[in-house]
Amino acid sequence: TFAEPDDASASGAENRWLTAFVTKVHNEIDHLTALDRQAGDGDFGTNMAAALDHYELPLRGDDRTVLTALSTSFLVRAGGTSGAVFGTFFRALAQEWPDELSVADVARAVRAGLDQVQALGGAQVGDKTVVDALSPAAAALDAADDDVDAAFATAARAAAEGVAATESSIAHRGRASYVGEAARGVPDPGALVTSWLFEAWAGVTRQLCTQSDHCN
């Protein structure tokens, strides 16, 4: 059963990228909760589940349609800062998502998402937030050439490296900032989820590229 107003299409082609992302988040809810208990107020996993648990998998529909649905899910269903941040990011991504896949156009969409997230809360790289994964991924796409497979793989690596960097930092934004040094050594769960989006994207793109020659 799909829930209005944020349901994805019940018919059409499977959206492999976003299905892979949502599946990964589903499978890691307990891990996300544990991380946030160490470096926050412990509700991050609950908020992710609230946003995504109602979806029947696989998700169906084109990227813009599913991104729009995910945006509404986070804005309507998820509580806390994470709902607003991810809802804002997915909304900007959906609004700018290209009809024809190209590295340059996707880079512009991701950059728009980053800009909206930073405008929302003012976070910068080093503040131990989603921006620590999103900003390097956006920069990697900005600098990439037209090889879709290579560009998305590079963006995924950049996001993962950004997550790793959050382990050695303390938070300067949100409730995680209240715990100070207790957050050091713990990766930011929001940055981690952001990296999974790029990881899923790169993985599905690699599969598609091995099946066709549309990537170069």
Q: Where does each model-flagged region fall?
A:
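N-terminal loops that bind phosphate or other acidic moieties
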Residues: 1-216
